[in-house]
Amino acid sequence: MIIAIDAGHGGQDPGAIGKNKFQEKNITLSIAKKLTKLLNHTNFFKAVMIRRGNYFLSVFKRTQIAEKYHANLLISIHANSSKNRKISGVSIWVLPKNVHNTRIQKHKLNKKTKNIHKKINTKTSKFKNFYEIEYDLAKIIIQELRKVSTLNQKKPKYAKFGILKFSQFPSILVETGFISNPIEEQHLNKKFYQNLISKSISIALKKYFLKRIKQYN
């Protein structure tokens, strides 16, 4: 199972900036590196990083890189921001089902997309569609993250983010906390907290795919 890890923003695009001037692009890269390392220490996943340093990549280029690595799944790492500095917590985003169904129909006759479906089915047996994979996995990631962090939302949220919309494989966006919240900004910049977030996502991924394999064997 090949998982593409996308560190949000980069280069001239710092992403959100906290009160203490910590930048989202640096936090996402650090968490992405830790998550990639954890996944590659398992015998179940091969993780590849889309952005490896401090440089800018368009959404289109990110999806291109993931496709180049023949990714079966994409996890995009971000940090949230709000004008209300009291808001905090983790949230997980997936593509709305109606948009998903339209996207699937558009790629239905695309041989490459069919091959991606085949790869997913080979590793995790039969899935109905991308939406099911994303939503069910997102719920398990939330279950794990709530053990180490506060939640902004108890269920996966819907959005038409470019990285979700233009990927030709299941994709999930993880907002690891609010960098606009001074306390959470400090947490997000600490290696200990980044390790907790990375480990939680790694555990969730393994739980989800093992569950699916057992379910359909």
Curated annotation (Swiss-Prot):
<dbReference type="Pfam" id="PF01520">
    <property type="entry name" value="Amidase_3"/>
</dbReference>
<keyword id="KW-0378">Hydrolase</keyword>
<dbReference type="GO" id="GO:0005576">
    <property type="term" value="C:extracellular region"/>
</dbReference>
<protein>
    <recommendedName>
        <fullName>Putative N-acetylmuramoyl-L-alanine amidase</fullName>
        <ecNumber>3.5.1.28</ecNumber>
    </recommendedName>
</protein>
<feature type="domain" description="MurNAc-LAA">
    <location>
        <begin position="3"/>
        <end position="206"/>
    </location>
</feature>
<comment type="function">
    <text>Cell-wall hydrolase involved in septum cleavage during cell division.</text>
</comment>
<dbReference type="GO" id="GO:0030288">
    <property type="term" value="C:outer membrane-bounded periplasmic space"/>
</dbReference>
<dbReference type="GO" id="GO:0008745">
    <property type="term" value="F:N-acetylmuramoyl-L-alanine amidase activity"/>
</dbReference>
<comment type="similarity">
    <text>Belongs to the N-acetylmuramoyl-L-alanine amidase 3 family.</text>
</comment>
<dbReference type="GO" id="GO:0071555">
    <property type="term" value="P:cell wall organization"/>
</dbReference>
<dbReference type="GO" id="GO:0009253">
    <property type="term" value="P:peptidoglycan catabolic process"/>
</dbReference>
<keyword id="KW-0961">Cell wall biogenesis/degradation</keyword>
<dbReference type="InterPro" id="IPR002508">
    <property type="entry name" value="MurNAc-LAA_cat"/>
</dbReference>
<dbReference type="InterPro" id="IPR050695">
    <property type="entry name" value="N-acetylmuramoyl_amidase_3"/>
</dbReference>
<keyword id="KW-0964">Secreted</keyword>
